Each structure stands twice: as C-alpha cells, then as structure tokens.
Swiss-Prot record:
Signal peptide span: none
GO biological process: iron-sulfur cluster assembly
Gene: erpA
SUPFAM superfamilies (UniProt xref): HesB-like domain
Subunit structure of this chain's protein: Homodimer.
Function: Required for insertion of 4Fe-4S clusters for at least IspG.
GO cellular component, one term: cytosol
Keywords: Iron, Iron-sulfur, Metal-binding
Organism: Serratia proteamaculans (strain 568)
UniProt cross-references to InterPro entries, sorted A to Z: FeS_biogenesis, FeS_cluster_insertion, FeS_cluster_insertion_CS, FeS_cluster_insertion_RrpA, HesB-like_dom_sf
Cofactor(s) annotated in UniProt: iron-sulfur cluster
Cofactor binding remark: Binds 1 iron-sulfur cluster per subunit.
Family label: Belongs to the HesB/IscA family.
Official protein name in the record: Iron-sulfur cluster insertion protein ErpA
C-alpha cells in the first residue's frame, strides 16, 4: 500500500501537472492550490479553488510533482475520501472534485449537499 492511498484526499497527477504549469506562469514558486468549501450553489455547498502563498495552522498539505494542494480543516471534513482532478473537455478545462460524501450534486458538479 502506498502513502498516497492513506491520504484523506487524493491530488491526481493531472491536477498536479496543471498546477505546476499555472505556478510557472505566475513565476511564484511559493503558490499552492487551495481547495475550500463554502455555503452556496444550488445544492447548499460549493467548491472553490484559489492560489495561496501561505499555509495556515491546521491546514493539510498534499504534495505531488513538487507542487502542493492545501485544504483547511473545516473543508477537509467534507472532502475525506475524495479527489481533486483536472479535466479538459467540451465543458472547458477545470479543476474538479470527486466527493463520495456528497448525497446530491448539481449538474455542473460545482455544488453539493451532504
């Protein structure tokens, strides 16, 4: 069993590769991809992504390919067992969360309920 399977949230190779490209474009190697959950959206909660150059007390950091994904403790409790991925398709390119804790999700996949 690898260390990756023990993590509460997976950070896919595709997501890490895209983060690496975006950070290189910004020319700031201290940036990390932060995933968070806020109230809102059509299903009650919604996912958010931003680049952040700091890690707060209690944040979980997951590193892959020399880049980091950061999640605050409150958001992590809703994301345990999930994954952060990057897709390109007819709907455009975007980071997506696969969340096994979501009972319902909206059509675009950016909001959910538990």
């Amino acid at each position: 069993m690898s260390d990756e399977t023990a993590l509460p949230l997976q950070f896919t190779e595709a997501a890490a590769s895209k983060v690496k490209v975006l950070i290189a474009d910004e020319e700031n190697p201290d940036l990390k991809l932060r995933v968070y959950i806020t109230g809102g959206g059509c299903s009650g909660f919604q996912y958010g992504f931003t680049f952040d150059d700091k890690v707060n007390d209690g944040d979980m950091t997951i590193e892959k390919q020399g880049v980091a994904l950061v999640v605050d403790p409150m958001s992590l409790q809703y994301l345990v067992g999930g994954s952060v991925d990057y897709t390109e398709g007819l709907e455009g390119s975007r980071f997506v969360v696969t969340n096994p804790n979501a009972k319902t999700t909206c059509g675009c996949g950016s909001s959910f309920s538990v």
